[in-house]
């Protein structure tokens, strides 16, 4: 039920993103405003992640997830009202994203308890595949729904997915008490103290920092998704093509996750993170040639194939964190992921108001490739240092 509820929520999220991108670009014709509103589906996590993710370590995780789903369903239902002004849509979007932080943290913290040991790694692979599959379906179908039904109806469908997710979690997931940390005694730390403690844990471990850096590479590979509407418009295509452009990378990511989970031994996955991280960004350089929609879709699919490195990085990161603080630490990591995605899309939208969207996508690919090369070196250095401290050969 945890898996199915997550698929429903994610599917609804992608429907909403396509609907909002089409709605804003249709009203304004502005790549900057489209990027700004799309970025609002990521940026509030800068606050919500650090301060609200700790709720997943202080409250029963199932109850927290159900409450967040119901609240998000209500917020998105209001967004679906026809003719809602853009400022109201933006404000409601911020509220919905803030509620995503504790939900995501609770889900990530709960999964290793439901499926411990090696089953967690397999579950991570399945989740990665199904999450990307839900993105493909959500983006591809979302473009068609937005074109046929309109943005308001598409947002209404999104609200229904949150309610369905809440029902599945309440009826199909066993209750578990809130986790406890022996170091904290019977009391609970404040949200600020919890966030600071999680930050210190990450900051004090070079390997965790390097793994987190890999996770944050998505800030470069997400740029084509955020610029899909102006990119399609620059190529003379319509709303249906927007959905295809958004779906291309998740399609490649599904294939990459299947190949990595099925044919690569666990010990080799970490060694492949670097090359795959480079692959997630380097193909975007080809967009500088403005090769047309079909070749662009192929380049984006190859980029998505490379993002399979996130599977190994996520499993290694979560398993290295104590269970009692897993929600907070994962929330901090997720906040960073969402924040860099939103900031990258916002910056890309601003630049795309002056340059061709294809050139902006290519620039993101070049910067991401350089960052991936740096992370290969950083993780290798952290692992050598850890081996030396343990008295093992480097």
Say what each PLM segment does.
Residues 1-394:
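Alpha-helical transmembrane-bundle signature of multi-pass membrane transport and export proteins
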């Amino acid at each position: 039920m945890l898996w199915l509820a997550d698929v429903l929520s994610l599917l609804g999220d992608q429907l909403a993103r396509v609907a909002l991108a089409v709605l804003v670009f249709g009203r304004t014709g502005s790549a900057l405003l489209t990027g700004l509103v799309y970025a609002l589906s990521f940026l509030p996590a800068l606050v919500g992640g650090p301060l609200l993710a700790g709720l997943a370590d202080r409250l029963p995780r199932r109850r927290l997830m159900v409450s967040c789903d119901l609240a998000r369903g209500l917020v998105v239902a209001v967004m679906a009202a026809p003719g809602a002004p853009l400022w109201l849509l933006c404000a409601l979007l911020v509220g919905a994203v803030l509620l995503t932080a504790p939900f995501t943290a609770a889900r990530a913290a709960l999964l290793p308890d439901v499926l411990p040991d090696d089953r967690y790694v397999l579950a991570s692979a399945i989740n990665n595949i199904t999450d990307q599959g839900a993105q493909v379906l959500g983006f591809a179908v979302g473009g068609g729904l937005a074109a046929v039904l309109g943005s308001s109806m598409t947002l209404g469908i999104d609200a229904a997915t949150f309610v369905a997710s809440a029902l599945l979690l309440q009826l199909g997931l066993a209750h578990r008490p809130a986790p406890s940390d022996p170091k904290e005694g019977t009391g609970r730390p404040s949200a600020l103290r919890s966030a600071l403690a999680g930050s210190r844990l990450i900051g004090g471990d070079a390997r965790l920092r390097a793994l987190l850096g890999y996770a944050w590479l998505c800030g470069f590979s997400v740029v084509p998704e955020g610029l899909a509407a102006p990119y399609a418009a620059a190529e003379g295509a319509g709303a249906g093509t927007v959905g295809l452009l958004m779906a291309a990378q998740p399609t490649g990511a599904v294939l990459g996750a299947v190949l990595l989970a099925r044919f690569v031994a666990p010990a080799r996955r970490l060694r492949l993170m670097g090359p795959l991280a480079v692959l997630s960004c380097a193909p975007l350089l080809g967009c500088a040639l403005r090769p047309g929609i079909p070749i662009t879709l192929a380049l984006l699919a190859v980029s998505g194939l490379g993002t399979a490195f996130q599977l190994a990085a996520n499993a290694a990161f979560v398993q290295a964190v104590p269970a009692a603080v897993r929600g907070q630490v994962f929330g901090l990591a997720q906040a960073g992921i969402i924040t860099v995605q939103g900031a990258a899309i916002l910056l890309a939208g601003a630049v795309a108001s002056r340059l061709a969207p294809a050139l902006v996508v290519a620039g993101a690919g070049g910067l991401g490739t350089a960052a991936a090369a740096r992370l290969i070196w950083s993780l290798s250095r952290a692992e050598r240092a850890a081996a030396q401290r343990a008295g093992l050969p480097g």
